[in-house]
Amino acid sequence: MSEKIYEYKDENNWFIGKMTGHNLISGWGVKHRTIKKIDDLLDGIAATLDWENPKGYDVSVVRYQSPLSLITFIIDMINQETQREIKVIPHAGTILLMENAKLLAVYLPEGGVSTATFFATSEQGFGDTILIATRNEGKTKEFRNLFGQLGYRVENLNDYPELPEVAETGTTFEENARLKAETISHLTGKMVLADDSGLKVDALGDLPGVWSARFSGPDATDAKNNAKLLHELAMVFDQKKRSAQFHTTLVVAAPNKDSLVVEAEWPGYIATQPKGENGFGYDPVFIVGETGRHAAELEADQKNQLSHRGQAVRKLMEVFPAWQAKQS
C-alpha cells in the first residue's frame, strides 16, 4: 500500500489524505450525516478484489465547504492507488460517479432533486452541457479543459452562428457577463455561462479593465493590445509599480432561474517585453506572481490550476450543485 500523502487546498476546502485498510473521514466543519452519506456513497468503490490488501481512504478535513470537492479528492486518491478511471460528474444538482460508461453511485443534495430535472438528459448521456457565451476558441479551449475534467460537455457560440452578438455595454465585469449570459439563455432556452475577464493594471487606474479586448482600438488584436500596454508603462521601471491582476467574473444563467455569479483574480506584474508561446490575450506580458514566469510559458494544465479563470471555475463548481438543486 502506498505511503503517499495527498493534499488539496483552496480558499474554502483543505483536505489531507492517505490510503489505509479502512475508510475514515474526520475533521472540522463537516456534518456527521454528510460524512455518512459520502462513506455510504463510496462504500465498495475503494475496495479491490485483493482481500488480503484492502485499500481504504483516511481523510482529515481542515476546511470544508462542498461535498463535490471532498468526493473529487477521495476519488482522485482511489484512482491513483488502484489505477481505476472513476469520473466525478456534477449533474442536475447531484454528483455522479461513473466508470467506463457505467453509473456506480449518485450523491444527492439535501432535499433531493426532482426526477424531471435529473432525467432531463440528452441522448449523449449523463452530464450537463454548458454553452459558453463566446466565439473565442482560445477561451473555449480553457473552459473545455476545465469543465471536461468534471464531466461537462462544452459548446460555444460558433455552434450557433444564427445568434446575434451581444453588445458589452456594461461598465463592470459583472454587468457585461450578465448581459451575455442572460440574453443568450433567453434566446436559446439553454444554460449559458458567460465570463467577462480582463487585466487591471494598478499604475493605469485598473485599465484596461472591461476594455481589455479592445484596448488598442476597434481593430484590436492581441499583439496590438500588448504593444499599447507596454507603451503605456514605458516610463514605469520598478516592477513592483507594474503590479496587475487578471480578473474574471462568471455568470451562469438559465431560463426561469436566478443567475449565479462568482469572481476571482490572479495577481502578478506586467513584463517589459512579451515571452512565451502558449495562452492568448495578455498572457505573454503577464508575470505570474513572484515566480518570474510569464503566463504564456505555462502549459494548459499549469495555467488552469493558477489562473483567474481556473480559480473562478473551481469556485463555480463549489456552489453550482446547490444552485442547480435550489433552482430546479
From Swiss-Prot:
The record's region (Unknown) falls at 1-129
Q: Which GO terms describe its biological process?
A: nucleotide metabolic process; purine nucleoside triphosphate catabolic process
Cellular component aspect of the GO annotation: cytosol
An example molecular function term from Gene Ontology annotations: dITP diphosphatase activity
**Cofactor note from UniProt?**
Binds 1 Mg(2+) ion per subunit.
Region spans: NTP pyrophosphatase: 130-324
Q: Which SUPFAM superfamilies match?
A: ITPase-like
Q: Which residues form a coiled coil?
A: none
* Residues annotated for substrate binding in this entry: T134, R135, N136, E137, G138, K139, S197, F280, G281, Y282, D283, K303, H308, R309
PANTHER family, alphabetized: INOSINE TRIPHOSPHATE PYROPHOSPHATASE, INOSINE TRIPHOSPHATE PYROPHOSPHATASE/HAM1 PROTEIN
What name does UniProt use for this protein? dITP/XTP pyrophosphatase
The beginning of the lineage is: Bacteria, Bacillati, Bacillota, Bacilli, Lactobacillales
